[in-house]
Amino acid sequence: MKKQVLIAGGGIAGMAAALGASHAGWDARLFERATVFSEVGAGVQLGPNVVRRLQAWGLQKSLQQVAAVPQQLVARSALSGQVLASAPLGQSMVERYGAAYVTIHRADLHTVLHSAAQERADIYINPGQEVAELLGTERVTTIRTAANKVVEGDALMLADGVWSKLRPVVLGDHSRPRVSGHLAYRALLPMADIPVGWRSNEVTVWLGPHMHAVHYPVRRGEMMNIVVIIEGPA
């Protein structure tokens, strides 16, 4: 009889966990509080190790349809604009690590994973069903949903976000979120609206006192993702 993992949360981590379990020969039963799956946020960078795993799951074509492949990483001074360091990406990553270094919008990555999970017969997706309580972990792992449904499995994966109700139950109060002392401001701009001189197919990092900023293309170069991180209270 196949083992079954119970997954709390249907975001990027939850969908990836379900696919990983499925490809490892497990059944995966995923529970998501929202009735409609969606992913908010902006861009994310995926190193070659992640891309190799997505390729192993048969997602190379889906990834290519939505991701960008930056050609280099450039670090600049936020004060002078001077180039401090650079490193090749693009084909250099493929030759060295066997896969590209890509940048992608989080919503696009979630769509790729969700679509792949829906095609797997051993992944059971349950929207509108929040995992509310962990009942036991002795003989089997037992959970109760917010609708008072009791479900048993062989393992539990918590992927229900930074405000998880179950993580403190499993790991204790020290696992609760803490203020980092940094604030992140994010934006997405159509590449066509950016002055030509600022458009690039690069990951650019601007380094300055008590701050740094990063921008890179997403959505096959049609959008630029920007994040500025500064020190400050929450």
Please provide the spans of the model-predicted regions.
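Conserved N-terminal glycine-rich FAD pyrophosphate-binding loop of Rossmann-like flavoproteins
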Residues: T35-Q55
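Conserved Rossmann-like nucleotide-cofactor binding loop
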Residues: A13, V36, W163
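Conserved N-terminal helical subregion
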Residues: K2-V5, S22, N49-V170, S175-P190, ...
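Active-site substrate-recognition segment that forms the wall
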Residues: S200-A234
